Amino acid sequence: MEISGLEWFRLHPTIFKEAWTDDEFVWPSRLPSFLVKVTADDGRYGIGEATSQIWYLGETGDQIDACLRAYDGALRGCDAENVALAHRAMEATVSGGMPGGRTTRSGVDMALYDLVGKARGLPVHALLG
């Protein structure tokens, strides 16, 4: 089962602060967030979420979008069931320290496990052990 491509959809979640005052923390009202869809050559797909804590990782929506574009090309043709190989392909394209890379890889990772679970008829928690 080979990866035929990635699709992503930008979300616009709103953050509601409960305990912090504006002068304590810089707390954005929105987070960079995407749903990530990894589709296999047989039509099956998995869904993941890539949401960054912008105040901690410093990753913007545009950076995540750029990484998703790079990963889309890098992952086409890769074995969808070999998650470690997919991570190597992503890291070879956009290194772990590049803004957007960590968040994006986590969303693709979730989508890959969802896809593999669907292909094997197993929930993701059974794959992870």
Regions found by a protein language model. Give the residues of each.
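Short capping/connector residues at structural and topological boundaries
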Residues: 16, 80, 127-129
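Residue-level preference for alpha-helix termini and adjacent loops
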Residues: 19, 54-55, 74, 123-127
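Metal- or metallocofactor-binding catalytic centers and their adjacent structured scaffolds
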Residues: 5, 39-119
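Catalytic pocket of metal/acid-base enzymes, prominently hydrolases
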Residues: 115-129
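Residue-level signal for pocket-adjacent positions within structured domains
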Residues: 15, 70, 122-123
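Structured beta-strand/loop patches that form or line metal/cofactor-binding pockets in enzymes
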Residues: 1-45, 51-55
